[in-house]
Amino acid sequence: MSCYNPCLPCQPCGPTPLANSCNEPCVRQCQSSNVVIEPSSVVVILPGPILSSFPQNTVVGSSTSAAVGSILSCEGVPINSGCFDLSCITSRYCGSRCQPC
């Protein structure tokens, strides 16, 4: 690439300075050039599933799960009574009282 510098050196006006400096703007002009930038490969790591648990008296994958399910209740209302919804459990953790069926 060929460049030229149109800035002329400053002429000292007085004693010779210790360093060459001038207050005139110095512009450097170069020919147009093409630059190709290739991005490097990016590795993105996505988080795995977030597992959360709530303290409940349930047994999963056991032959006794049917028996345990019959004694589970929320504020005295059996979970398997046919009129149970999740608002009972969630309201229990939020501090409000469950409504009976």
UniProtKB/Swiss-Prot annotation:
Keyword line: Acetylation, Keratin
GO MF annotation terms: structural constituent of cytoskeleton
Keyword Acetylation assigned: yes
Modified residues (N-acetylserine): S2
Transmembrane segments: none
A Pfam cross-reference name: Keratin
Alphabetized InterPro entries for the sequence: Keratin (IPR003461)
Family, similarity comment: Belongs to the avian keratin family.
PANTHER family named in the record: BETA-KERATIN-RELATED PROTEIN-RELATED (PTHR31203:SF1)
The protein's assembly and partners: The avian keratins (F-ker, S-ker, C-ker and B-ker) are a complex mixture of very similar polypeptides.
Name recorded for this polypeptide: Feather keratin Cos2-3
Source organism phylogeny: Eukaryota, Metazoa, Chordata, Craniata, Vertebrata
